[in-house]
């Protein structure tokens, strides 16, 4: 039973992090390149790679 719960948690985490991974993998030169990738999330261009920050509920 524990195994199934762990599996469900891992699946949920994987599904929620896909857009973030996509954003991290996107190559960029400027912040504007990251805007369309990160959309609602704040993004920054670091070492030529987009990094998206997930907005907290606050």
Swiss-Prot record:
This is a cyclic peptide. GO terms for molecular function: serine-type endopeptidase inhibitor activity. It is found in: Secreted. Expressed by the venom gland. Residues 1-23 form the signal peptide. The record marks 55 as: Binds trypsin. Is very stable at high temperature. The keyword Disulfide bond applies. The record marks 55-56 as: Cleavage. There is a cross-link at residues 24-55 (Cyclopeptide (Ile-Lys)). The modification Serine amide is found at residue 56. First cyclic scorpion trypsin inhibitor (Kd~0.5 nM). Does not inhibit chymotrypsin. Trypsin inhibitor cleavage and cyclization are only observed in the presence of trypsin. It is suggested that the inhibitor Lys-55 is placed in the S1 pocket of trypsin, its C-terminal residue Ser-56 is cleaved, and the cyclization occurs via a peptide bond between residues Ile-24 and Lys-55. This is Cyclotide trypsin inhibitor TopI1. It comes from Tityus obscurus (Amazonian scorpion).
């Amino acid at each position: 039973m524990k195994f199934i719960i762990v599996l469900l948690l891992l699946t949920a985490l994987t599904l929620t992090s896909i857009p973030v991974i996509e954003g991290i993998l996107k190559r960029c030169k400027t912040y504007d390149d990251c805007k369309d990738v990160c959309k609602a999330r704040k993004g920054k261009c670091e070492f030529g790679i987009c990094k998206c920050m997930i907005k907290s509920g606050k």
